[in-house]
Amino acid sequence: MKLVHLKKLFSIVKTTTCAAIMLLVYAGGAAYANDRVSEAEHLVTALITELEQISLRDDMTDKDNKQVLDQLVESYFDVDAITRFSVGRYWRVATESERSEYAKLFRFVLLNQANEQFHKLRDLEFKPTTTNTKGDKLILVGGIIHDKSGEFPDVEIFWRVVALPDMPVKIFDIEVENISMLKF
């Protein structure tokens, strides 16, 4: 797959985000998700705790940061679903080779973007505020990100956590001040 095609696939994220989220949101009753609210809250809290601890380490190189971020992404995020969702309808028609190449490129871009912002975590803290269910598979864990240095104002954040039957909960999206990671 040529780089031009991969760039087009990235641009499709904006057009497919609404449809997929609507499917998740309206996928049924809230009973199952309600049973897993504490699991979703724990997932977000555990991720925040790990990020805070890692950000305080002074012995980390860029390579170390990327490796740790890769492990965190694998543990806490539904990377496969995010990757498929970011491509939208083109995922179904892509060959296995194209899917594999896109998944590698998507992960590379995701980790590089996260690594570029990693140093800013030292001054941030997460204050949980609310948790809501949307349908029977989606849980929104909300909170405020506070910048202890005072350089930036507080921002509202929602972690969109998917709770599928017989699967561990995983983060599917992060929404900061009503801007979705998947819409960006």
Q: Across the structure, where does each feature detected by a protein language model lie?
A:
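Intrinsically disordered, low-complexity linear regions
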Residues: 71, 78, 82, 133-135, ...
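Solvent-exposed loop/turn segments at secondary-structure junctions
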Residues: 91, 108-109, 147-148, 176-181
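Boundary at the C-terminal end of the N-terminal hydrophobic targeting segment
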Residues: 31-35
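Early exported N-terminus immediately downstream of N-terminal targeting peptides
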Residues: 36-116
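Short beta-strand edge/turn micro-motifs at domain boundaries
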Residues: 154-183
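Surface-exposed, charged secondary-structure patches
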Residues: 112-155
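C-terminal segment of classical bacterial N-terminal signal peptides
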Residues: 21-30
